[in-house]
A protein has these predicted regions:
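Conserved small/polar residues in nucleotide/adenosyl-binding loops
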Residues: 1-6
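Secreted, periplasmic, or luminal enzymes acting at the cell surface/secretory milieu
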Residues: 8-24, 95-248, 254-256, 303-304, ...
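Acidic/histidine-rich helix-loop elements
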Residues: 9-33, 57-64
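An anion/phosphate-binding loop that grips the pyrophosphate of nucleotide cofactors and donors
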Residues: 43
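Glycine/threonine-rich flexible loop motifs
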Residues: 50-70
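A short helix->loop->beta-strand "cap" motif at the edges of active sites that frequently abuts
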Residues: 82-90, 109
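Intrinsically disordered, low-complexity Pro/Gly/Ser/Thr-rich segments with frequent PxxP/GP/PP motifs
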Residues: 259-295
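Short, surface-exposed ligand- or partner-binding patches at beta-edge/loop junctions that are enriched
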Residues: 285-313
Length: 340
């Protein structure tokens, strides 16, 4: 937006009612369509920032935290229409504290940058990525679902319940039997949480676990896995920058565990590789990484069998495979059943 279209929002902030727990949101500013049209003619690119805060003592709400508001949807649509008509690009920066819905609007943007909450140097950090001074190499630590209803925890978590507010110490929360699982949650999903659920049951997602783009490309080769004397496994894989700019790559290794399709068992990042340059990463996969908790034994148990390792760029982008053989089941770690 050009200089003459800047607006002071101090009055909007001052008008917000006092809220000791910080749950109240600042009303979203609406931008006149004429301003957007004028900016599309004078500016090189549009950058839209979608913000979400975080806090303590309350869960993020589905309607106001996960979903974008009507004002945010209209802003993205109007800016996209105006700038694309002028053959210019639109970038959406997600300055958020958790997963937000992206499936309904991401096609309107040419790029989506997930900055999380980067603090006072956010502007400088994001600018360096957008201008190409830094080649992005971050990866998602969670799955972005198409809908919240697709999550395995959807049926068991009171996602739209907002407890009572109080100044000072938390009050005794009244019993609310009409709302499911407010006071007690039965985690019936068990191991099937996040990507372990989505990938095991082949559920479509917006962005898979471990996903992340780069300005360059990488090739994987020469994967070798060997058993070590201590019972762990040493994996090496060669990564080559096949693109046109320098960058780093995150290699991720997944293995099947019990009934799970796979779970992350190792990962590593290369140094900055110049175009055409290669590096061989050495990763260790421990017995504990491959083990699953057995309630009957109160222990982490490594099952016998053949394990196929998937080596790739994210949970749904396997580039290479390697194999591990475990000849007999092994109790890796015992724990005490103190909660029984």
């Amino acid at each position: 937006m050009c200089i003459r279209d800047r607006r002071i929002i101090r009055d909007t902030i001052a008008a917000r009612a006092y809220d000791p727990l910080g749950y109240a949101a600042i009303p979203e500013l609406t931008i006149d369509s004429a301003v957007i049209a004028r900016s599309a003619q004078t500016d090189d690119v549009a950058i839209i920032t979608i913000g979400r805060s975080c806090g303590e003592g309350a869960d993020r709400l589905h309607a106001t935290e996960y979903l974008l508001s009507d004002v945010e949807h209209r802003l993205i649509a109007q800016v996209s229409r105006a700038f694309h008509a002028a053959r210019k690009r639109v970038i959406v920066v997600l300055n958020v504290s958790g997963v937000v819905e992206v499936a309904s609007w991401r096609s309107l943007a040419d790029a989506v940058v997930l900055s999380w909450l980067p603090g006072q140097e956010a502007g400088d950090a994001v600018c360096r990525v957008l201008t190409g001074k830094v080649c992005p190499s971050g990866r998602l630590t969670m799955t972005f679902p198409l809908r919240y209803e697709d999550c395995s925890t959807y049926d068991n978590f009171p996602y739209d319940y907002h407890g009572p507010k109080a100044i000072g110490n938390y009050p005794k929360i009244p019993r609310t039997p009409a709302i499911k699982n407010v006071h007690y949650v039965d985690y019936v999903e068990g191991m099937y949480v996040g990507y372990r659920y989505f990938d095991t049951f082949n559920r479509p997602v917006a962005y898979p676990f471990g996903f992340g783009l780069s300005y360059t490309t990488f090739a994987y080769s020469d994967a070798v896995c060997r058993a070590q004397a201590d019972g762990n496994f040493a994996l090496s894989v060669k990564v080559t920058n096949t693109g046109t700019c320098a960058g780093k790559e995150v290699v991720q290794v997944y293995a099947p565990v019990r009934s799970l399709r796979h779970q992350l068992v190792a990962f590593g990042k290369t140094r900055t590789l110049q175009p055409g340059e290669s590096e061989t990463l050495s990763l260790t996969i421990t017995q504990r990484d491959l083990a699953c908790f057995d309630e009957a034994q109160n222990a982490w148990v490594l099952d016998a069998g053949d394990y196929t390792l998937e080596i790739g760029a994210n949970a749904r982008d396997a580039r290479l495979k390697a194999h591990i053989q475990v000849s007999a089941p092994l109790v890796v770690e015992r724990v005490n059943g103190v909660l029984r």
